[in-house]
Amino acid sequence: MDKPIIILGSGGHAKVVADTLKLLGKQVLGFVTNNNDSLKKILDINILGDDSILDKYSNIDVDLANGIGSIPYDATRWDVAKRMRNKDFRFPSFIHPTAFVSSDVSLDEGVQIMAGATIQTGTSIGMDTIINTAVAIDHDCSIGKNCHLAPGTVCSGGVSIKRGVHVGTGSVIIQNITIGKDTNIAAGSTLYKDVKSNITLFKN
């Protein structure tokens, strides 16, 4: 039986996560946020308080969903997930009902697959990675943990993306390309050759 879910964060990505979970029929208990805003509800779901409220919950009773957005040069999303896992909370993966995910695709914990995404056969997606709106990933790709493929990204077959990579909106990655870890790809890029680790690639 599915546990109720508490969403971390209260920004735009948290709204999308909440909307997706509602479409999937999940019970969302509320949001936790450290932002000092005046909001009391988002999508008619209560803001429960800051993350200290989680001390009142057990990992036996609730699961978490990471609603903290992923942007380049900001590890907040991944740091918070690590801290909550150290308290034994679990982050289930979820797939938007309009996404297509081939039956043999491997998803690690905490993967978020958003509306209209396509993930083809032979592909694996690492822990806590966001496959955002209308992303297309073709056959036999490997996407590492803590990645964000922003809306409209296209990966041809055999692409390998290492951990911690941010691929900007509308980028296109040609077949069999490898992107090294902790690299940021600017929106609208087209990649024809491998990209090294720990760099920022501006639009070419």
Task: Give the residues covered by each predicted segment.
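Short alpha-helical
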Residues: 12, 72-75, 106
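Conserved acidic residues
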Residues: 29, 62-63, 163
